[in-house]
Design a protein with these regions (language model features):
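Hydrophobic alpha-helical transmembrane segments of polytopic membrane proteins
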Residues: 117-139
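Membrane-interfacial segments
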Residues: 23-31, 62, 104, 108, ...
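Loop-to-helix entry region at the N-terminal start of transmembrane alpha-helices
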Residues: 1-46
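Internal alpha-helical transmembrane segments of multi-pass membrane proteins, especially GPCRs
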Residues: 7, 76, 114-121
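Structural signal for membrane-spanning alpha-helices in multi-pass inner-membrane proteins
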Residues: 16-21, 101, 127, 131, ...
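Transmembrane alpha-helices
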Residues: 69-96
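Hydrophobic, glycine/alanine-rich multi-pass transmembrane helices and their short helix-loop junctions
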Residues: 92-114
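Membrane-embedded alpha-helices of multi-pass transport/permease systems
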Residues: 37, 41-69, 133
Length: 141
């Protein structure tokens, strides 16, 4: 599992990090650690959680003699539930740390909300793509 997980997280994480840093945020110096480290940490940590949930569920489904496709579909859906629920709750039930920190530091709340939406969408996208890559690599074995 380790190689497939590493490839899945690496490809998805780097892809999303490059897209955000270069095209969405458009920083002058894209490799500056104060930008790259927190964004990469949020992307990779959440993708890792989703991937671990999916793999655990996938292995359970396969142990029940489910087909590869059925186990993949079930684990994909169940692993993304926490991410989708957190998207639904942002701003209504919970205020994420990044958004709260920006608001407390004096940033316009609308800008803070835009950044938070971007991060949440990126986390969901990165998690989904890392799952897709993992299952594509698993299918070949």
């Amino acid at each position: 599992h380790f190689i497939k997980i590493s490839i899945s997280l690496g490809l998805s994480g780097v892809l999303h990090l490059v897209l955000i840093i270069n095209f969405i945020l458009d920083f002058e110096i894209f490799y500056e650690p104060r930008y790259v480290i927190p964004i990469a940490g949020m992307i990779l940590a959440n993708s890792m959680n989703v991937l671990s949930l999916a793999i655990e569920r996938f292995d359970k489904e396969l142990s029940r003699n489910e087909s590869f496709e059925s186990a993949r579909k079930t684990s994909f859906k169940s692993a993304l539930i926490p991410q989708i629920n957190s998207l639904l709750a942002v701003g209504l039930v919970s205020l994420p740390g990044m958004m709260t920190g920006q608001i407390l530091s004096g940033i316009d709340p609308l800008i803070a909300v835009r950044y938070q939406i971007m991060i949440m969408a990126t986390i969901l996208s990165s998690a989904g793509i890392s799952l897709i890559i993992y299952f594509l690599l698993s299918k070949k074995n």
